[in-house]
Regions:
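Bateman (tandem CBS) regulatory domains
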Residues: 440, 451-464, 470-473, 505, ...
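Short aromatic/basic micro-patch
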Residues: 449-452, 500, 531, 567
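The conserved cystathionine-beta-synthase
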Residues: 466-484, 491, 510-517, 531-558, ...
């Protein structure tokens, strides 16, 4: 592209040397990734501090055996007690599983969130998980990264869809740094946070942020994978592939059970008529009592996952732990503990795979791999079935193993597990509450825009009414004088609408002069009128237009009060939608310019 002398004038030099929009997005994405990587280090440092300050010395006492074992419940209870001051200082921001609320803020409210929740989330999750309660840190670190991305968006004064993308970029960076898996971080943000609705330009932001966060994490921790998975191979593909497919079905079934128990237990705790500060303590006590017999359920369970992957799991113990970990996670988060479900899902998947693999290997030792291989595939498959995010699970496992041979089994089990779980329950573990609230965050951007526009802002308030007692000839005169409207509300003596009349209604009597003179508008009008209120949205209006094949709809004060306040025209709805799309496009474009 040639630049003229005019372009080189002082007034144009500033803009000439400014980076393009895509370059600015990459710069901001890099910044988000670096900060997300640092946040991951801070998060893990605080978690390790709590763990070594409370859990390690406490468990050392309990490990002496005898009556000391009965003191184990005090360890997880101590963490919940320490949450109380935080909950009092910051009501509504400490207790419970918060990822569903996070998804609502990202996909419905544009990703705007409070910065202080970063610190609160780090502390509350560290106290919950670091003292042995059953939860994971991956969901919270995604929220922390997302909140940081949102904060950076505010600093650069971006708005609209850009804030949402930067929030997702922070999530990608947080997860990538946690697992040392940049590709999985990208798809976590794309599949789980953005629910699969993103543009190509947004995808590049996720990639850059995830990569930079991984660089920071590897610089600090090294290139050590989250789980050192042994060398994997298919002993006999023809025999093992069907076995993995069966395991995929099993993963889907258990995932549905997991989701059901998770929300059932939470609902039971919410129904308890006691102080919210007491509920997490009760939950922690239950965890501690269970851990006396099965300590593997405590915390994120990563140590036991490593044992299972190494093939050291005992069949009956792993089988019991499937249900105990499901219950323990539901109790911890359902009672008000702070944390995520990512790590528990990995734990449950590993013990399902480990126990299943032990059984099939004992039955067919010459054609199957060891139980550790099935546990490794189970890690990702159960995560996929629980979150309905198979691509994230596939890449996560691939990056953790670095073995391309694992791709085929993990693809099959993840897709089958997700398909089974989705068939039995349309919601993932993160979207159940949204469905209960009748919020559909899977809908596209177009529908979201239409639902944001109220009918009251689009209606034509100047309406020509016609009395139900008027004769048809008078109506025809009105039609002849009409310029752009051929739908007229029919009103009674009180002024309330009793029907609507259109050209379609009078076509049948146009050539019957006698009937035209004797019939009234009330005789031929449509009585069963489809109406809207000013508070309805234009998405509902367009649905009505399409179903009935009409061009105008009367707008009344309320369904009970048929007092017409205006008419809504299909073309006005389309114009309003186009204006809003243009407005959002200009807003996002302007926001990107402000980065300079």
């Amino acid at each position: 592209m040639l630049h003229t002398e005019e372009d080189m004038k002082p007034g144009h030099l500033k803009t000439f040397f400014l980076p393009g929009e895509n370059t600015r997005m990459v710069i901001v994405a890099s910044l988000i990734g670096v900060i997300a990587g640092v946040a991951n280090i801070c998060f893990r440092t605080v978690l390790e501090f709590v763990h070594h300050s409370i859990f390690v010395p406490g468990y050392a006492i309990v490990s002496q055996g005898g009556w000391y074992t009965l003191l184990l419940p005090l360890i997880p209870v101590s963490g919940m007690v320490l949450l109380i001051p935080l909950a009092i200082l910051f009501p509504g921001e400490i207790y419970g599983y918060g990822f569903t609320k996070f998804l609502r803020k990202v996909n419905i409210r544009g990703g705007s969130m409070k910065f202080r929740k970063n610190i609160l989330k780090i502390i509350s999750c560290s106290l919950t998980i670091g003292t042995g309660n059953s939860a994971g840190v991956e969901g919270p670190i995604a929220q922390v990264g997302g909140a940081l991305g949102s904060a950076i968006g505010k600093i650069f004064k971006v708005s609209g869809n850009r804030t949402k993308v930067y929030t997702a970029a922070g999530c990608a960076g947080g997860v990538a740094a946690m697992f040392n898996a940049p590709i999985a971080g990208v798809f976590f943000a794309a599949e789980i946070v953005l629910l699969g609705t993103y543009e190509i330009s947004s995808f590049s932001v996720l990639v850059v942020s995830s990569a930079m966060a991984t660089v920071v994490s590897r610089s600090y921790y090294g290139e050590i994978p989250a789980f050192p998975i042994p060398e994997f191979h298919l002993v006999n593909p023809l025999a093992e592939i069907p076995l993995y497919m069966i395991m995929g079905v099993l993963m889907g079934l258990v995932a549905v059970l997991h989701i059901y128990i998770f929300y059932e237990v939470r609902d039971r705790f919410e129904a308890l008529n006691i102080s919210q500060h007491v509920k997490p303590i009760i939950g922690a006590f239950i965890i501690g009592c269970t851990a006396i017999f099965f300590p593997q359920i405590m915390g994120d369970g990563y140590h036991y996952i490593k044992d299972v992957l190494a093939g050291h799991g005992v069949i009956w113990v792993m089988a019991i732990l499937i249900f105990l970990k499901i219950f323990a996670t539901a109790v911890t988060l359902g009672s008000g503990g702070s944390g995520g479900v990512f790590a528990p899902a990995l734990f449950i998947g590993s013990v399902i795979g480990g126990s299943y693999g032990s059984i099939v290997h004992n039955l067919f030792p010459s054609v199957t791999a060891s139980s550790g291989a099935y546990a490794a595939v189970g890690l990702g498959a159960f995560l996929a079935a629980t979150t309905h995010a198979p691509i994230t699970a596939i890449f996560l496992l691939f990056e953790m193993t670095g073995n391309h041979l694992i791709i085929i089994p993990i693809m099959l089990t993840s897709i089958i597990g997700t398909a089974v779980a989705s068939k039995l329950n349309a919601d993932s573990i993160d979207t159940v509450d949204l469905t209960r609230e009748r919020i559909d965050i899977h809908e596209g951007r177009e529908i979201a825009i239409m639902k944001s526009i109220r009918v009251g802002k689009v209606i034509t308030e100047e309406v020509d009414f016609i009395s139900e007692k008027a004769n048809v000839d008078h109506l025809l005169e009105i039609f002849q004088m009409a310029k752009d409207s051929f739908y007229f509300p029919v009103i009674d003596e009180t002024g309330h609408m009793v029907g609507i009349i259109s050209l379609q209604d009078v076509k049948g009597i146009l050539h019957d002069k006698e009937l035209r003179l004797s019939a009234t508008v009330g005789d031929i009008c449509t009585r069963n009128v489809l109406t809207l209120t000013p508070d309805d949205n234009i998405y509902t209006a367009m649905t009505y237009f399409d179903v009935r094949g009409i061009a105008e709809i009367p707008v009344v004060e309320s369904p009970e009060d048929q007092w017409v306040v205006g008419m809504l025209k299909r073309r006005d709805v389309i114009d309003a939608y186009n204006r809003e799309v243009l407005k959002k496009g200009i807003s996002e474009r302007s926001a990107s310019i402000k980065l300079t």
